[in-house]
Amino acid sequence: MSKAQAVGSNYRVSLGLPVGAVMNSADNSGAKNLYVIAVKGIKGRLNRLPSAGVGDMVMATVKKGKPELRKKVCTGLVVRQRKHWKRKDGVYIYFEDNAGVMCNPKGEVKGNILGPVAKECSDLWPKVATNAGTIV
């Protein structure tokens, strides 16, 4: 995660999207899905795949979508994940799909966000919170 641009408190979220995961695009930027190729801010351990969770910034490529977006490396934010995680109040939460939005390296979203967004992501990235329809 790019700590210089992210604001708010940092949450412990179960990491559900390893490198190589394909997630739906939750915005109207023209991409249909995003293929995770790297996770920002992961130090890691030898032979362990870096994984992303809700609120993490990832480097991704577009596998389906507009031709001008494909075959380029872009940055994205994970806004929903299927893997459950536990919140501080004891509630386990998960979504029905893995989804992310395309953004610039500062965390500013390129399009409008479709569908719900996790509270952990909206607290960390204020530009996501302003564009989100519903925050869960």
Swiss-Prot record:
GO MF, one example: large ribosomal subunit rRNA binding
Pfam families: Ribosomal_L14
Superkingdom of source: Eukaryota
GO BP terms, alphabetized: translation
Cellular component, GO, one term: extracellular matrix
Keywords: Ribonucleoprotein, Ribosomal protein
Record-stated family: Belongs to the universal ribosomal protein uL14 family.
Designated name of the protein: Large ribosomal subunit protein uL14
Organism, as annotated: Dictyostelium discoideum
Gene name of this polypeptide: rpl23
